[in-house]
Amino acid sequence: MPGNGPAPAARGLRAAWRHRGPLACALLPLSLLYRALLGLHRLPYALGFRRAGQAGIPVIVVGNVIAGGAGKTPVTLALARHLRDSGWSPGIVSRGYGRSTDDCREATPESAPADVGDEPALLARASGVPVFVARKRIEAVQALRARHSQVDVVISDDGLQHLALARDIELCVFNDDGIGNGWLLPAGPLREPWPRPVTAVLHAGACPPTDAPAFAMQRQLAAEGVNAHGERIPLAALRGRPVEAVAAVARPEGFFSMLASEQDLALEHAQALPDHYNFESFQRLGRNEDPLVCTEKDAVKLWRTHPQAWSVALQLQLPPDFWALLDQRLQALRRPRA
């Protein structure tokens, strides 16, 4: 499976995060400094000098405590669909990481990722619910409710460390790496100490240490791809052909592995590009006539120059016990408003 991957420095650091080896130990003093800075950030809230903004409706925070992708966006999509199907009117707020703008704005299915961020652009296209972005999430919530008065529950995407927005439910998502070596950045992958109190833990690999209810996520790729023209193709139709795959996500190797193992595709080339890559200078490694496959997040940017690329969605399944817990918590929050 020829192709390029993350920079050697990034690969080395991620490898170091799995163990408490020489490199991780050398970085440990910086982790102690990082922990002190975290404490200073939280102190005004702990002492009551700063207060979290109140949304006025239930807020579900989806986040993680590890650096890099953990699968938050598929969880946010699954939540939005479940809530909508359960009679709620959800809305989504996000910071909009990587965008060229800095204001509070709505992300629509037509929004460019450069204007709202990659994840909000995907959420706006795929969720069917209103999405707003702002650096201060409470501003996004206020704008969301002002324009969409029917919204009665908010999902905050990647908001676990954003203390300025009060929350009722916290969901912490873990990928296959779990907590790695258990150390804080940069000696380890943790953005904050773990374990910490949360409503529930959602994990793709082994369950991390926690006292919270924990639920295993089942992830798989969709069985078909879609291009910029809305045409669809079963991935099975690509078997036996040389396929080029590209991914600009936190863990591109996971996407490539699933294409090969789940869909039995022969990846002639696999390009792993930096997360949030803009694709303006993207060049194919293979022949133009060979199928080009990409992640759902990358599709809108790639389609500007390669509309024939096949976007493959990541599908997520969560156990019934998780949905029962979520519904129970939300009903308890809804009763006072009945």
UniProtKB/Swiss-Prot annotation:
Its EC number(s): 2.7.1.130
Residues passing through the membrane, by range: none
SUPFAM superfamilies attached to this UniProt entry: P-loop containing nucleoside triphosphate hydrolases (SSF52540)
Gene Ontology process terms (BP): lipid A biosynthetic process; lipopolysaccharide core region biosynthetic process
Entry-linked Pfam families: LpxK
Record field: catalytic activity: a lipid A disaccharide + ATP = a lipid IVA + ADP + H(+)
Superkingdom of source: Bacteria
Pathway field: Glycolipid biosynthesis; lipid IV(A) biosynthesis; lipid IV(A) from (3R)-3-hydroxytetradecanoyl-[acyl-carrier-protein] and UDP-N-acetyl-alpha-D-glucosamine: step 6/6
Gene Ontology molecular-function annotations: ATP binding; tetraacyldisaccharide 4'-kinase activity
GO CC terms: plasma membrane
Enzyme class: transferase
Keywords carried by this UniProt record: ATP-binding, Kinase, Lipid A biosynthesis, Lipid biosynthesis, Lipid metabolism, Nucleotide-binding, Transferase
UniProt-annotated binding residues for ATP: I66, A67, G68, G69, A70, G71, K72, T73
InterPro entries: LpxK (IPR003758), P-loop_NTPase (IPR027417)
Record's function text: Transfers the gamma-phosphate of ATP to the 4'-position of a tetraacyldisaccharide 1-phosphate intermediate (termed DS-1-P) to form tetraacyldisaccharide 1,4'-bis-phosphate (lipid IVA).
PANTHER family (alphabetical): TETRAACYLDISACCHARIDE 4'-KINASE, TETRAACYLDISACCHARIDE 4'-KINASE, MITOCHONDRIAL-RELATED
Family membership noted in the UniProt record: Belongs to the LpxK family.
Protein name as annotated: Tetraacyldisaccharide 4'-kinase
Source organism (scientific name): Delftia acidovorans (strain DSM 14801 / SPH-1)
Source organism phylogeny: Bacteria, Pseudomonadati, Pseudomonadota, Betaproteobacteria, Burkholderiales
